[in-house]
């Protein structure tokens, strides 16, 4: 079971949204990490065959997915960043409706919906209307619809967008439970979404995969070192201008800084272990905080 992406490219006029991307996925969780606008959504839309690439190919066990038509789509489960639903449908009715669209027989659909509602902890809320659900409940209903056909490939585009911290943790745990014997590709611009659950992390910037590997491999790829030290309030701006500052913690009379630098920033600086958050700052810089519309 292997999904292979070969030199995948997508252009919109003169703009290249995805630029010669290549990687291979087998069973496990893959985290596609990048700022909004990096090309993650465009890549996922090609992987789900919603749009065709300008160049390159996507192969499932050696077969071109665009030539497999319905066979490939039967293997897919997809949760887009914004998924549609009828607001007056209950959660149960919504899932049964999606099951019918996916060609699942009514008797089998009832059993599958019941199982998934319990798995995503929505069984007791199954009669609630979709329009009355919290953001977290909607995302859990979304993951349930993506899992209706027990897909071999589960693709999740910014699945924790708009969720509070507790719902993010709950969602991550759910993804881990559902990963099992399947490929899970999860895109996000939030490091904590994938830091502890992804078998492999793919950093995407300007339409390209800049680096990939396990979390430890990605962290060790960063050439800069990480330092912490305290400075008086009057010196904070100077360090902000001179270095990549990963974190500022206010303390009496000044601040404790976490700084990325190849050399020791000052004599008081202590080197500490780098994290994936530090790597994200290194590769994406100021754009790491950009929340523009995804591409």
Question: Where are the language model's segments positioned?
Answer:
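Conserved ABC transporter NBD signature motif
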Residues: 56-67, 71-72
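Conserved ABC ATPase "signature" region
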Residues: 96, 100, 107-125
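Walker A (P-loop) phosphate-binding loop of ABC-type ATPase nucleotide-binding domains
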Residues: 35-39
């Amino acid at each position: 079971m292997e999904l292979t992406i070969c030199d995948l490219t997508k252009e919109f006029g003169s703009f290249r949204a995805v630029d010669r991307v290549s990687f291979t996925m087998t069973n496990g969780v893959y985290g596609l990490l990048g700022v909004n606008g990096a090309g993650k959504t465009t890549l996922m839309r090609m992987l789900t065959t919603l749009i065709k690439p300008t160049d390159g190919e996507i192969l499932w066990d050696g077969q071109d997915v665009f030539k497999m038509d319905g066979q490939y789509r039967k293997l897919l489960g997809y949760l887009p960043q914004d998924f549609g639903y009828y607001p007056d449908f209950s959660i149960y009715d919504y899932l049964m409706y999606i099951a019918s669209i996916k060609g699942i027989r009514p008797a089998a659909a009832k059993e599958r919906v019941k199982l998934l509602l319990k798995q995503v902890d929505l069984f007791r809320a199954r009669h609630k209307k979709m329009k009355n659900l919290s953001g977290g409940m909607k995302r859990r209903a979304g993951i349930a619809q993506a899992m209706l056909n027990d897909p071999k490939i589960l693709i999740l585009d910014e699945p924790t967008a708009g969720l509070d911290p507790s719902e993010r943790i709950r969602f991550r745990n759910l993804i881990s439970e559902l990963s099992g014997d399947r490929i899970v590709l999860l895109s996000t611009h939030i490091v904590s979404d994938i830091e502890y659950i992804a078998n492999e992390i793919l950093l995407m910037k300007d339409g390209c995969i800049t680096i990939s590997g396990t979390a430890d491999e990605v962290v060790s790829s960063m050439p800069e070192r990480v330092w912490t030290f305290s400075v008086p309030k009057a010196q904070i701006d100077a360090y902000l201008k001179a270095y990549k500052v990963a974190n500022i913690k206010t303390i009496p009379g000044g601040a404790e800084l976490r700084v990325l630098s190849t050399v020791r920033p000052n004599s008081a600086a202590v080197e500490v272990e780098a994290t994936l958050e530090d790597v994200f700052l290194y590769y994406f810089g100021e754009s790491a905080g950009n929340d523009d519309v995804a591409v």
